[in-house]
Amino acid sequence: MRYLVICITAVLAHMSLTIPYYAWAQTQPAGSAPSGYVLVEEDVIVTFANEPKKSFRTAVGDFLNRQMRAAAAEIRKGAAYLKLEAARASGDAKKVLIDSVQELEKLANDVQKAAVADLKELQNAFARAEYALARHHYLKAVELRAKGDGQKTGRELQAAADYVDSGQVWLTQKMHEGVSDVVNEARLVSAKMVYGSGAAADEVGRAFEGLGKELDKFGSTVGTLKK
């Protein structure tokens, strides 16, 4: 069973998660975390997959209200969650997440200094961050599907679908019309997998194929955004 060793800088309050800043992935038995750290199952982390998008949307509201310090704090929350996900990612997915973390941290600093005038800078950075998360969760789902773990596969597929969907909020142009149907199909299949209600192999395959194509289109659009 995989765990994340996490430095205790996180708190849960009012159903909102502040993500710890330092984390690294470990494969080890429970109880072996060093002093000042906790050992958290990866499954627990996935349950908070929606936190970055909440922070990003709150940051936009704060930015528009000229509450720059508050906006910067929300951007840092999102960046910290991406750093946490990067700790359990690998290969190119890890690099894309880390690149996004660095972009968000710089953006937060600039916002706090009132050095950002254009909302589009936030929107573009958030689109890249949500693409990085969507791709990461999708690749995790592919990995877990190959291992035959239906429930965990479903959770990761759900998170990937959510970020393919919510990431469109930040794009300067809408993705093509059929994306909602693909996302909804992936969500339906993922729910069946999570709750064990019997997702057929062919519908699982279609969900992965369809979402993978939408993810590629999302990535192509994000690649054209100005940094």
Model-derived regions: residue spans:
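Positively charged n-region of N-terminal signal peptides that target proteins for export
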Residues: M1-L4
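Sec-dependent N-terminal signal peptides
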Residues: I6-V11
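C-terminal segment of classical bacterial N-terminal signal peptides
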Residues: H14-Y22
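Long, charged/polar, soluble alpha-helical segments
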Residues: W24-K227
